Design a protein with these regions (language model features):
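A short, flexible N-terminal coil/short beta segment enriched in small residues
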Residues: 1-44
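C-terminal accessory regions of radical SAM enzymes
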Residues: 8, 13-23, 159-164, 169-173, ...
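Canonical Radical SAM [4Fe-4S] cluster-binding loop centered on the CxxxCxxC motif
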Residues: 199-263
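Conserved SAM/AdoMet-binding glycine-rich loop
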Residues: 7-19, 74-76, 101, 255-396, ...
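A general structural detector for well-ordered alpha-helical segments in enzyme core domains, enriched
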Residues: 34, 63, 85-92, 120-123, ...
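Glycine-rich beta-alpha loop elements in corrinoid/cobalamin-binding modules
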Residues: 47-176, 426-430, 440
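Extended catalytic-interface subdomain
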Residues: 159-163, 169-215
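Alpha-helix termini
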Residues: 63-69, 117-126, 219-221, 232-239, ...
């Protein structure tokens, strides 16, 4: 399907551009639910355009021209993964007359810019020049904006960020989450660039939201984070911080922990999932960082409602897997009776060195990680056809490497643990994930404190702080 074949109800159109990985076929709950909210509550038709790093700007702009025709483009940008190519695309489209809106996670801090950038020229200056508006918080906040685009007074639009005529950035307080907007999602509204055209993406993996935010980010914890190894003279020193959640997690700062959604809301989302050829719902990731205590109740309700599921993917911390294991054992026989496969798709191990785990503020130890792995392997022996956990079965567990604290000692500890417990056989992902420091994460505060103390500065790459480069003297 190409854009010119997409029929508009009213001639008013909007698109949401989001970052995507090549050759994947998963859905994107946030942008696709936002597009659904827009279509159901405004005169606008809305699609999601998933853009990989390989996509050429000329191809993207041609697709937008084909979609919008002579209408002024209204384009949202969400979940951009810090991609500077998409930041500059938004700036170019805005200069050409499009209305561009930055939304999704970290929209507020990325629109406003890094803390103290006005007095520190090397810091991320924000994206207020790239976008007409920012929108932080629930997607339905865009409804009054779209219904009043030509109004000058925007002070009553919740969650909106915009620049006054005098250059001042205004931030309106966002509204609370409202579950009536979280019940429905269209999964047939996402498109990709393919052979110089836009094609409908037939997804094979969906998402269902059960928790907003992470329970580990619900409260603040005192922590100490070591200096990076790049500053050799300070290896015995650390920075004291008050952090919510893992130190690298910008979502912990963005959302914290809102809480659990009603079972009815979760079931309504499951109903929206497409069916596979066998009549069952396609596999989905359950968005809940601590899903095991509620899993038996969810499966009972699914059975009560007559829903046919194929596979549930679970993402959680290693310690919460251990503490919730009895609930998983309770749920697996019910899953077996219903023909549902459970995949422990991503356990947040992140490292197998205690120093690095402490600096990541994970709140767990290598011993806990290994205990979880032993229990996962044991569970697989008990329920060989009902549960999966290994990379061969499609799991992709958290493993952050390299980090700012890598040394000969940490490397030796990690390699020893990997080979002692055979982690390369079933746990380690094909590629590790380098430590990424978003400017608004806890580690962003850590970097800025080091810069202040040592009169140094680290290079910024858009919204990301380049910890891997040698620092410069002020």
């Amino acid at each position: 399907m190409v854009f010119s074949n997409i029929k508009s109800r009213s001639g008013q159109k909007m698109a949401i551009i989001t970052s995507f990985f090549k050759d994947e076929a998963y859905g994107l709950l946030g942008p696709q639910m936002a597009a659904t909210v827009i279509e159901d509550n405004t005169p606008y038709d809305c699609i999601v355009i998933a853009v990989t790093r390989e996509a050429g700007r000329t191809s993207i702009k041609k697709a937008l021209v084909d979609y919008f025709g002579k209408e002024r483009p209204i384009i949202g940008f969400s979940a951009l993964s810090g991609r500077e190519d998409l930041f500059s695309l938004a700036l170019e489209l805005k200069a050409e007359g499009a209305i561009t809106i930055l939304a999704g996670p970290q929209a507020n801090v990325d629109f406003v810019g890094e803390q103290g950038w006005q007095n520190h020229p090397h810091r991320f200056k924000g994206l207020s020049a790239n976008f007409n508006f920012g929108l932080h918080g629930p997607a339905e906040q865009v409804i009054p904006l779209l219904n009043n685009l030509d109004e000058d007074d925007r002070s009553e639009i919740p969650g909106l960020l915009y620049v006054d005529q005098d250059g001042t950035v205004n931030q309106n307080t966002p509204k609370d989450w409202d579950e009536k907007y979280l019940r429905k999602v269209r999964w047939d509204n996402i498109y990709i660039l393919k052979r110089d055209a836009i094609a409908l993406l037939n997804i094979n993996m969906g998402q269902v939201l059960q928790h907003i935010g992470c329970p580990y980010a619900a409260r603040t914890r005192a922590t100490e984070i070591d200096y990076p190894v790049s500053i050799e003279s300070r290896q015995a020193e650390s920075i004291k911080l008050q952090l919510r959640g893992c130190s690298f997690c910008d979502v912990a700062v963005d959302k914290g922990f809102y809480g659990k959604l009603d079972m009815e809301t979760v079931i309504d989302q499951i109903r929206c999932l497409p069916q596979a050829q066998d009549g069952r719902k396609i596999p989905f990731e359950l968005i809940n960082e601590n899903p095991l205590p509620n899993l038996p109740d969810l499966l009972r309700e699914v059975h009560k409602q007559g829903l046919k599921l194929s596979q549930i993917n679970l993402t959680l911390r290693a310690d919460w897997f251990i503490s919730g294991l009895q609930h998983l054992r309770q749920a697996l026989p019910a899953a077996a009776a219903a023909g549902i496969y459970v995949l422990l798709s991503s356990i947040g191990f992140e490292s197998f060195d205690d120093t690095i785990l402490r600096n990541l503020n994970k709140g767990i130890s290598v011993e806990k990680n290994i205990q979880a792995i032993r229990l996962m392997r044991q569970l697989k022996e008990e329920f060989p056809n009902q549960i999966g956990y290994s990379t061969k079965e499609g799991a992709n567990h958290g493993f952050i490497h390299p980090t700012a604290w890598d040394s000969k000692e940490t490397e030796a500890n990690i390699q020893k643990t990997i080979y002692l417990y055979g982690l390369q056989n079933d746990i380690l992902p094909p590629h590790s994930t380098p430590l990424i420091i978003h400017h608004a994460s806890g580690l962003g505060d850590w970097i800025r404190e080091i810069e202040h103390r040592e009169q140094l500065w680290f290079k910024r790459f858009g919204s990301i702080i380049g910890w891997w480069e040698s620092p410069h003297h002020l």
